[in-house]
Structure formats: structure tokens, C-alpha cells
Amino acid sequence: KKDQPMFMPLPSDQTHYGYFNDFMTYNSGDWTITTAEDGTGSATEAMTSGAGGQFLITNAAGDNDHDFFNLKGESFLITGSKRAYFSARFKVSDATQSDFVMGLQITDTSPLAVSDGIFFIKDDGDTNLDFIVEKDSTSTDTTAIHTMADDTFVTVAFFVDPDTALVHYSVNNAEPVGVVNTNLPDNEELTISFGIQNGAA
């Protein structure tokens, strides 16, 4: 496993570019934020105490109330000709009654139904984490790659490998699994995209 590209040390910033955030601090102005607040209360976003840095998203109380984030500026063009790597660590309080997404997407107010991106997603009503590679609303779906649990951290990663025409994904540092890059979104700049939607009131 140590020879897999996605487990290599971080590359030099002189030959690569990227975005890194441990959420020791948070500036809402860096993000395009989309919320729905039909239930009681309001969506909130705040730093919270926790080793390594933690960012807490709290939705309003209604079914389908949500809070989604797109990093401003679409800075990542994934053509498949160069290596690209993404990783994130997160948890959800209710692993069943929720929809969430984490990955790279175009800026969209509906990231659960986006047209272009490479991302991890979970649907309401189950605990199955899925991995999606999507271009122009046509996707390669790899379903049920992991079972989410309430209030339990998960680490997800993907690596675009130009040498094999594959996109590799990994959960909790397990052996990477490769999927075809047929639907790699190579004609759109992408950005960091994540968020959560309530599955019940």
C-alpha cells in the first residue's frame, strides 16, 4: 500500500498547487453558502473545539433544510493528463436521516444534484457512502463503498492517475480501488464542495 500514489507525502508547492484547510479558523466570505431554513431555528456554521481543528455545521430543524458550501473560485481543472488528489475527514450526527456531499464540483446551489464533479455522497434513508465521477450529468457511480455510522469520523480520498486512466478512491486509508475515468469532468473548472441536508424534521 505504501507504493500507492495517494499515500505519498504532500508534494512541493513549487510544482503543484492546492487548497488545504484544517479549520483552525473560518471566514464565511471565502465560501458561497446555500441554505434552506424552513423549519425552526437557523443554519449555523462555527468553529468548535476538537483535536486537529473542527468546523460544525448545524441545520435548521425542517425536513430537507440544508447548508452547502462551495469555495469561491473554481480553481481545479481535472483533465486526466496530470495527477490530482483530494482528501477530507468528517462525520455526521445522524448517518441515516441525512444527505451529504464531499468532494470537487462545479459551483452549484444544488450540490446533491450537480452536473459535474468527483465526489462522495450519501442519500437520505440509508447509511451507504457512494463515489461519483460525473461529466455533463452522465456519471460513473460506485455505490455502498462504506457504511456510515452516527457521530463517527470517516476519511475519504481520491486520486486521478493519468498513467492508468483510472480514478482511485479510498476510505479510512484502505487499499485504493480504481474506477474508469470515462466521465471525468475534464471540461469544467471545479471547486471544493461539501454540505449536509436533513432527511427528516
Question: Each predicted region: which residue ranges?
Answer:
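Secretory/extracellular carbohydrate-interaction modules
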Residues: 58-130
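Short strand-turn-strand beta-turns centered on an Asx-Gly dipeptide
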Residues: 171-175
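Short, aromatic/His-centered strand-loop micro-motif at the edge of beta-sheets
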Residues: 133-155
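Localized edge beta-strand/strand-to-loop motifs within extracellular or lumenal beta-rich domains
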Residues: 152-167
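Extracellular glycan-recognition surfaces and repeat-rich motifs
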Residues: 29-56
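Beta-strand-rich interaction surfaces with strong enrichment in secreted/lumenal proteins
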Residues: 71-78, 141-148, 180-182
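Extracellular carbohydrate-recognition regions
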Residues: 1-37
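Flexible glycan-contacting loops in extracellular carbohydrate-active proteins
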Residues: 179-201
